[in-house]
């Protein structure tokens, strides 16, 4: 893929999340996908759907803004901002706090055969926990 095609694929994968349809994962990722999230590795469609659905349940008004998309070789990098209100219970964030959060992150997408086969996700999870009042601010 060209750098522009890789950037477009990474961009569209994020835009699909805004549609809140976990089944769109199959459009951008192969069945053996691997996401390296800050606190766990997600492998395959079922784990990916569960991970995304849990996040949508916790933050039903989630808004994702792509700040930058760059690409070279078989990788694309996205820098984004996620905003949302904690309205659903999850194992990670507990019962709803009703608080808003905003977090910036970066994802490295590795692309093969027109699909994103592996991602490395980095964002400040501590900041999210502090904004939700789950841990004290420092």
Regions found by a protein language model. Give the residues of each.
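C-terminal and inter-domain tail/linker signature
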Residues: 1-138
């Amino acid at each position: 893929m060209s750098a522009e095609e890789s950037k477009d694929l990474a961009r569209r994968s994020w835009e699909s999340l805004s549609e809140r349809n976990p089944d769109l994962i199959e459009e951008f990722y192969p069945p053996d996908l691997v996401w390296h999230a800050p606190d766990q590795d997600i492998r395959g469609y079922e784990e990916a759907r569960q991970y995304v659905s849990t996040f949508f349940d916790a933050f039903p008004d989630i808004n994702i803004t792509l700040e930058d998309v760059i690409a070279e070789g078989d990788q694309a990098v996205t820098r984004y901002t996620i905003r949302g209100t904690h309205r659903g219970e999850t194992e990670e964030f507990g019962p709803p706090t009703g608080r808003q959060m905003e977090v910036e992150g970066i994802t490295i997408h590795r692309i093969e055969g027109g699909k994103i086969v592996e991602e490395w996700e980095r964002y400040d999870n501590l900041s999210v926990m502090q904004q939700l009042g789950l841990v004290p601010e420092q």
